[in-house]
Amino acid sequence: MMEEEECGLGKSCARSEPVAAAQPAGSPGETPAVAAESPELANYSSKCVFCRIAAHQDPGTELLHCENEDLVCFKDIKPAAPHHYLVVPKKHFENCKYLKKDQIELIENMVTVGKAILERNNFTDFENTRMGFHVSPFCSIAHLHLHVLAPADQLSFMSRLVYRVNSYWFITADYLIEKLRT
């Protein structure tokens, strides 16, 4: 079942029940028009800003080159570090809370893309990065997205709080992978 909710940036996003994120095209959570358009849009919500960006329907967002056809990457509109990128799956997943063990590869691919974007922008000190996810209900956008921040030692005081490692509201990609494996 899909409901609209305010999810940040003054936009409305679709909120789904945990199982809806993994349902196939034509599932109860999608409108018939969207599900019928194409298999690639099976988990697409026109009300979700990240779904629109991933579908190249937001001309104001510059997508960065990404070697993974299932992901898109772009700069965060409110950067917390000199390098602050978001890696977003084209498929709509509400947030990391709804991921299962069989989606570990997705998270690993998101990290790989994040590192590649940093390298392409001449940043290679991966010990000085922060890659992670906000945990519900602290997600500003109800669409899974990996924050890639570097250099981590240049985060402001507030940003160090907002992106605090393995807190109640932000977890690293490594921590998420570890939790999904257990």
UniProtKB/Swiss-Prot annotation:
It is found in: Cytoplasm; Nucleus. It comes from the Eukaryota. CDD domains: aprataxin_related. It catalyses: adenosine 5'-phosphoramidate + H2O = AMP + NH4(+). Belongs to the HINT family. The lineage of its organism: Eukaryota, Metazoa, Chordata, Craniata, Vertebrata. Exhibits adenosine 5'-monophosphoramidase activity, hydrolyzing purine nucleotide phosphoramidates with a single phosphate group such as adenosine 5'monophosphoramidate (AMP-NH2) to yield AMP and NH2. Hydrolyzes lysyl-AMP (AMP-N-epsilon-(N-alpha-acetyl lysine methyl ester)) generated by lysine tRNA ligase. Forms dimers to octamers and even larger oligomer. Interacts with CALM1. Its EC number is 3.9.1.-. Pfam families: DcpS_C. AMP binds at residues 76-77, 145-147. A motif (Histidine triad motif) lies at residues 143-147. Residues 1-34 are annotated as: Disordered. One of its GO terms (molecular function) is nucleotide binding. The active site is at 145 (tele-amp-histidine intermediate). One of its GO terms (cellular component) is cytoplasm. Its main location: cytoplasm. Keywords: Cytoplasm, Hydrolase, Nucleotide-binding, Nucleus. Transmembrane segments: none annotated. It comes from Bos taurus. Residues 49-158 form the HIT domain. This is Adenosine 5'-monophosphoramidase HINT3.
